[in-house]
UniProtKB/Swiss-Prot annotation:
Keyword terms: Ribonucleoprotein, Ribosomal protein
Family: Belongs to the bacterial ribosomal protein bS21 family.
An MF annotation (GO) of this entry: structural constituent of ribosome
One Pfam family matching this protein: Ribosomal_S21
Name the record gives this protein: Small ribosomal subunit protein bS21
Origin species: Acidithiobacillus ferrooxidans (strain ATCC 23270 / DSM 14882 / CIP 104768 / NCIMB 8455) (Ferrobacillus ferrooxidans (strain ATCC 23270))
Length: 71
């Protein structure tokens, strides 16, 4: 859990903004959303495999666009 020490004479809003930023970097909200409901191991594997396929297609598209620009 991210912690933020409030500095002397620091406005609350600034400290809150720093805390929100540190939570975002730590991935707290995404982890909470992921754990909100139970996900079967097979569903998790399917989701991860689909994400991997999507990343691979995106990488291939970027690579092909890069090759097109070279010529």
């Amino acid at each position: 859990m991210p912690t933020v020490r409030v500095k002397e004479n620091e406005p609350f809003e600034v400290a809150l903004r720093r805390f929100k930023r540190s939570c975002e970097k730590a991935g707290v909200l995404t982890e909470v959303r992921r754990r909100e409901f139970y996900e079967k191991p097979t569903e998790e594997r399917k989701r991860k495999a689909a994400a991997a396929r999507k990343r691979a297609l995106k990488r291939m598209r970027r690579q092909s666009m890069r090759l097109v620009r070279l010529y």
